[in-house]
Amino acid sequence: MAEITTREKLHEVALSAPKTSGVYLWKDKAGTVIYVGKAKSLKNRLSSYFTSNRDIKTRILVSRAESIEYIQTENEYEALLLENTLIKKHKPRYNINLKDGKTYPVLKLTNEEFPKVYRTRNIKNDGSKYFGPFPNVSAVDMFLTLIKHNYTLRQCKQLKKRETPCLYFHIGRCKAPCCGKISAEEYGKDIEEITLLLEGEMEDVSGTLKEKMKEAAEKKEFEKAARLRDGIQAVYALRGQNIVQDMDPESRDYIAWAFEGAMVSIAVLKMRNGRLVGRDLYRSHSLKEEGEILSEFISAYYTSANEVPPKIFIPQAAEGNALIEKWLNEELHAKTRISIIPLEKESLAAEERSAADSLTEIEEAASKTIGYAVKEPAPLSAQEEKLNLSPAEIKHHKAALKMARFNAKEDAMRRLREQGDFAAVEDLQKRLNLPCLPQRIEGFDIAHLGGTFTVAALISFKEGNPDKKNYRIFRLKNTDGVIDDYASMREVIARRYTRLLNEGADLPDLILIDGGIGQVNAASKIVDALDLGIPVIGLAEKNEEVYFPHNSKPVILPRRSDALRLLQRIRDEAHRFSNTRNNKLRRANKLKTEFENLPHIGKKRAHVLLKAFGSTENLKTLTAQALSETAKISLKQAEEVLDAVKTTNNNN
């Protein structure tokens, strides 16, 4: 008799569940809760996960689950309360987790004696001034370039007293407050002008900038004039985006969402006292159906009564609306009402609009009143009539919801472009008979030059595309100067996964090695010793053969298969990343040697000069006095160094 599969066991649990309301928990092999859901009928809901036409996000859950548990409740509202409690307790991987949320950037003017201005997405209660949020990141960057070239503010992360100024002072990009070369009062004059620009009081300041642009053009300094022109345009663009006002003083939120596979994008427009004060954009795993997403999101998004506005508007009816409104009022003690204002389905042309056009529409929306994009309203529907709002008010709220939905859909499309290769992930699992979908794959490659400058590259792919925030480079300690790829592989695998285990971090579903059976066996030895239970494979470049540990007979994948294409992408990316870092180390060593070969410059001074100026070529622009202060050598010695630099460059 064939052994029963995990899927069949889970299906039996679903079929035996009661038809009462309750909460269910999916767990993986380690007993970790990976998803929590609620149901009016536990049996009906759990059984629905095993129908043949389920979507990708459901197949992901079933492939990763090892067991199901459920808790019965007296009614659906109790199930909602219990679900919320369990989600906060277990923080399951496939429930909404707002830690990964994304918002539009703001500009931060720090609360310091010598402030700096920079872009951030994190707003803290630290006394700093914040301006924004700004949808157009390019305009923010152009504005910062304007600041950098015209106001010479400090650029260091922390202001520390120094004896000699940094490179930015010598090239005219900083006034060196760290060395006392400018007073706080004088520095503050630039800060006042920048603040006026950001607050919209810009006529005098922009006039000065336009005069500078005109002067630069007359002097044929066209690059400088172009920077000033772009900066002035950025200032006007940001002024349009900084606030959006309307005539309704009541506070409210507009929430819309868009699904893509197992991920959901949710946009929130926050209106307070007639002003758009924020646009929050969140991405998260969620296995909820579209009609259920609202209750899970709201219970995660709002955590106290003062965060909840009197009104929340959504674009479509959702399961559990009444329950979540009851939860807000009774559990958070917030007096609020959730209202539905249906939006017409967008045309195919609108949905396929390019990203550039989409961004333009967002900017236009942000620079006008929020009723920017709605045509003359059709007669009110029965649902709209129940809201007791005028046609003009309905039009107004529809425009805001349309803007929220547009943001969510654009984010979903952007994510699809970033990581949409799920077909290859499924094909890889099927062809290599892997135990679960390899959603997270980590690839390794070793690079060296005759055993020197040995580095190991770790690259990460998530759901079929690069996950660059998890890329890592390892300078190998035990094999530098020795050609031993197997020992190098053992070292990097041990360092990587010992750390992940100690931190309790998520492990990958598959490890890919750039190499053949020898490298695979070396990596597998460490994986087995750590008892990770992660499959290890290798891709040999010569014939594109896939190797498993302790099996010299390779698997040959079809040349045009999605699975092989994905493995090649990962292998090639790891190879590129390791070689790039290896070459960088070799160049840095060459440059350091060039500094060390200069008179009066030893290893320590070479390190200081390399960090400050980057190359000996850049020393030619310095005065002997500046070099003397930076390298801490006498003026005569500095002159000899500069003479040596000029002689060397002339010979080359």
From Swiss-Prot:
GO MF terms, alphabetically ordered: DNA binding; excinuclease ABC activity
Recorded coiled-coil stretches: none
Keywords attached to this entry: Cytoplasm, DNA damage, DNA excision, DNA repair, Excision nuclease, SOS response
CDD domains for this protein: GIY-YIG_UvrC_Cho
Subcellular location: Cytoplasm
Transmembrane segments: none
Gene Ontology annotations for the cellular component aspect, listed alphabetically: cytoplasm; excinuclease repair complex
InterPro entries: GIY-YIG_endonuc, GIY-YIG_endonuc_sf, GIY-YIG_UvrC_Cho, RuvA_2-like, UVR_dom, UVR_dom_sf, UvrABC_protein_C, UvrC
UVR domain location: 203-238
GO biological process entries: nucleotide-excision repair; SOS response
Domain GIY-YIG residues, every copy: 19-96
Gene3D superfamilies named in the record: 5' to 3' exonuclease, C-terminal subdomain, GIY-YIG endonuclease, UVR domain, UvrC, RNAse H endonuclease domain
Family: Belongs to the UvrC family.
Subunit structure: Interacts with UvrB in an incision complex.
Function statement: The UvrABC repair system catalyzes the recognition and processing of DNA lesions. UvrC both incises the 5' and 3' sides of the lesion. The N-terminal half is responsible for the 3' incision and the C-terminal half is responsible for the 5' incision.
NCBIfam families, per database record: uvrC
Protein name as catalogued: UvrABC system protein C
Source organism of the structure: Treponema denticola (strain ATCC 35405 / DSM 14222 / CIP 103919 / JCM 8153 / KCTC 15104)
UniProt lineage: Bacteria, Pseudomonadati, Spirochaetota, Spirochaetia, Spirochaetales
